[in-house]
Every structure is written in C-alpha cells, then in structure tokens.
C-alpha cells in the first residue's frame, strides 16, 4: 500500500521501539528547524550587535503568530490523512491530500497579503523600541513574504509524517539547515544585507527544503499524490480537515497572542532586557523542541491507531511518551541551568552584563518547570490525534490568560521575574485541563471496547 520503505505503519509492532524510531528523526528535524532561528540570533548578535539582535528577537511572537498557524493547520489536516492510512483507505488518503493542498494554497495567499500590510501596526502595538523598530519591520516583512514557503514545507513534511515517514523530512531539513548557515554568512557578512539578510536566508532555505520534499513525494511516495478525481467532491473532506486543523492552527496563534503581550511588557524594561529575553527564549525553545516533537509523534500514533480501532495501544504509547519527556526535561533542564551563563555568552560578542543577567534569570525560572510542559505536549498531542481540536484551543486560551495575568499583576511587584514565571504558570494550568480530558477520553474508549 505504501509504495515506499520509509513509510511506517504505527498500528503494528512493539510500541516503544515504533515510537522511538519514529520520534528520533522528528526530534532532530525540529531541532534543525529551530536552529534556523538560533543561527539568525547567533550571527546577528555576533556581527550586528545587541540592538539589531533585540530587533530580530522582538519579532519572535509576531513571527510565530503567522507561521505557527500554518504549522498547526498542517499538523491538524494530516491527522485526517493518518487516520485514513491507519484504516488502509487509499482513495480517502488521496482526497485528504487534495483537501490539504486546497486549504494550504488559499490560506497562505490570503494571510501573506494581510500580514505584510500589518507589520508596522503590529510592531507599534507591541511598543517596539524606537532604536529597533526599522530593523524589526524589515526583518518581519521578509519573513511574512515567505509564508508560502513555510506553508509548503509544513504541508509536505506533515503529510510524510502522517504515513510514518519521519526520516525524509529530516534529511531534507539537514541539507536546508546547512544551506541556511551558509546563506546567513553570505548575506550578512559578505553582502552586508544587515537583518534583511538573515530573513532572506531563512525563507530561501525553507523554500528549497519544501521543493525537495515535493520532488521526493512525486517519485517515492505516490500514495500521497492526489489524482484529478481526488479534487472532486471534497467539500466534506475539507470540512473534516478544517475541523481539526483550524483549532490547531488557531491554538498556536492564540498562544502567540500571549507571547505578544509578554513581549510588550519585556519592551518596557528596555533593549538589554529584550536582548536577554530573546537569548533566554531561544535557549528554552531548543530545550523544549524535542518534547514538542514527541507531541507530534504521539498525534500521528494516536491518529493511526484510532483509525485501526486499537485504543489500548494509544494508552500504552502515551505512557511511554510521558516517561521519555519527563526524564528528558529533568536531565536537560538541570544541565541548562548549570551552564546558563556560558550558553548565554555564545549568542553575543561583548555582551553587557545586564543582557547576560536577564537571560540567565529567564532560564533559571523556566527550566525547573519543563517537565510540566512535556506533560502538556503529550496529552495535547494525543487529544489532537483523536480529532479533537477544540479542547486544545481552550487550553491555549487558558495559556494566554496566564501569560497576561502574570506580568499585569506581578510586574509592579517583582519586575522582570513576572516575565519569567508567565510561561510556567501557563503550562501548568493548560496541562491540568489536558490531563482531565485525556483520562475522560480513555475511559470512554474502555467503555466502548467493553460494549463491543
């Protein structure tokens, strides 16, 4: 049925080994994707200075507001593909791909135009400092113009993962990441394109990765190639994909709203705080990326196994993923805290002690709570894999509320620390909701099995 050795059926075989071997390429691939942003931060910080580093960093929440939507939308739409793959229905697999393409093309075209025109109003709304505004505007405009490239990569990569192929996106992303480093150095250091060079390098690298993914699917995974017939009478399929994909996409965008509010409060502490927060946030995102990757794995795993009616296998898979995430969070969190100061120093040359202090403080308040975030990722990913996008979106609204409340209530009392504790508070509140919903769903499956 698959047409490719790289395709993996997650409804059969030993659960732990299936999850582990599927997860490793996803983890490495997502780390490489995160390195796009980290490399920009490193090179901008080392070559252009702290002001331009703060400019690039101040756009991160706005960047994720748009790009996070497509990441969630693609992952959600691919849940439907994974369920049809688990059920072995080739015709429906192709229809789901056709619907995914239609949704991706229309949404990326509309949002690219809208967001490019909203760059400056967005930055003004966030209270971006005068010395960083022009640089931030230039960088973000180019990133938004690259939305179609981001959409195309996430569409193709998520489709490959939906049929159990996590290696191919990794190989292509590895090539693209190396290219990104080279283009960063070429555009910033040689061509002197300033922060615009960093943005162009990121967009070009992701576009190349997306094109290579498309070529691979055309020649190696023809199961994912829709026919002309696949595009007919797909209204129901589009609706099914939007039912899962939109809440997942909006979930990311809603979370980014909380990040924007947080960025507004960070901006009030000045450019050194913005630079320190940027570095600390980049470090934390690298730490969190493997756990987020396992969340993507469990979503695919749950989707395929629900399609096959193997509910007990879902429960066991979740337990294995929880063990992986919690163990990782404790170990890596401790190491990150231990080496927080030297890690911070890597990002800028001649960085001020103020910037280092802000960054280290952020890391020290976040790392002890990473295990909570890991649990949130696993429970949320499972619920999304079971075609429920509404509950995770409600969880995202809770996260936003907590991210807003922390600085609003505490900034006048504990200052910058209110920024640091906003994330852990948001993770904990949302995780408790996901935990409750997960166990309710598992109980429902148990009753369903008993009745059968």
Enumerate the language-model features and the residues they cover.
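Short runs within selected transmembrane alpha-helices of multi-pass transporters and secretion channels
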Residues: 74, 143-161, 169-177, 198-213, ...
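Residue-level signal for short hydrophobic patches within transmembrane helices
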Residues: 12, 16-35, 39, 62, ...
């Amino acid at each position: 049925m698959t047409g490719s050795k790289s395709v993996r059926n997650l409804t059969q075989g030993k659960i732990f080994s299936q999850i582990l071997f599927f997860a490793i390429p996803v983890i490495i691939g997502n780390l490489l994707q995160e390195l796009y942003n980290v490399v920009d931060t490193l090179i901008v910080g080392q070559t252009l200075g702290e002001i331009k580093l703060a400019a690039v960093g101040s756009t991160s929440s706005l960047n994720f507001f748009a790009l996070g939507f497509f990441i969630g939308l693609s992952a959600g739409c691919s849940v439907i593909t994974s369920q049809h793959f688990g059920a072995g229905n080739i015709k429906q697999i192709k229809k789901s791909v056709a619907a995914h393409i239609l949704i991706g093309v229309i949404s990326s075209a509309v949002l690219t135009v809208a967001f490019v025109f909203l760059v400056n109003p967005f930055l003004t709304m966030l209270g971006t400092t005068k010395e960083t505004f022009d640089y931030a505007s230039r960088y973000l405009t180019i990133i938004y113009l690259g939305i179609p490239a981001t959409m195309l990569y996430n569409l193709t990569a998520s489709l490959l993962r939906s049929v159990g192929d996590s290696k191919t996106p990794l190989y292509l992303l590895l090539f693209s990441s190396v290219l990104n480093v080279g283009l960063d150095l070429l555009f910033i250091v040689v061509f002197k394109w300033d922060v615009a060079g960093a943005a162009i390098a990121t967009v070009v690298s992701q576009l190349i990765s997306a094109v290579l993914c498309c070529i691979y699917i055309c020649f190696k995974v023809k199961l994912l190639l829709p026919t002309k017939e696949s595009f007919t009478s797909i209204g129901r399929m589009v609706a099914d994909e939007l039912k899962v994909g939109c809440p997942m996409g909006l979930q990311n965008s809603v979370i980014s709203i909380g990040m924007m509010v947080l960025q507004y409060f960070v901006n009030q502490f000045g450019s050194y705080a913005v630079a320190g927060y940027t570095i600390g946030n980049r470090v934390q995102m690298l730490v969190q990326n493997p756990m987020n990757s396992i969340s993507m794995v469990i979503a695919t795993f749950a989707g395929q196994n629900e399609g096959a009616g193997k509910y007990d296998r879902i429960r066991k898979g979740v337990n294995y993923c929880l063990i992986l995430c919690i163990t990782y969070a404790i170990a890596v969190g401790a190491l990150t805290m231990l080496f927080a100061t030297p890690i911070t120093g890597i990002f800028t040359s001649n960085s001020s002690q103020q910037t280092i202090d802000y960054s280290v403080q952020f890391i020290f308040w976040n790392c002890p709570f990473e295990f909570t975030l890991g649990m949130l990722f696993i429970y949320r990913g499972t619920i999304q894999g079971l075609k429920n996008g509404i509950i995770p979106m409600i969880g995202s609204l809770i996260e936003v509320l907590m991210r807003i409340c922390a600085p609003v209530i505490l900034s006048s009392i504990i200052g910058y620390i209110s920024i640091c504790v906003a994330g852990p508070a948001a993770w904990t509140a949302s995780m408790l909701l996901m935990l409750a919903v997960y166990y309710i769903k598992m109980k429902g499956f148990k009753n369903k099995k008993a009745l059968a």
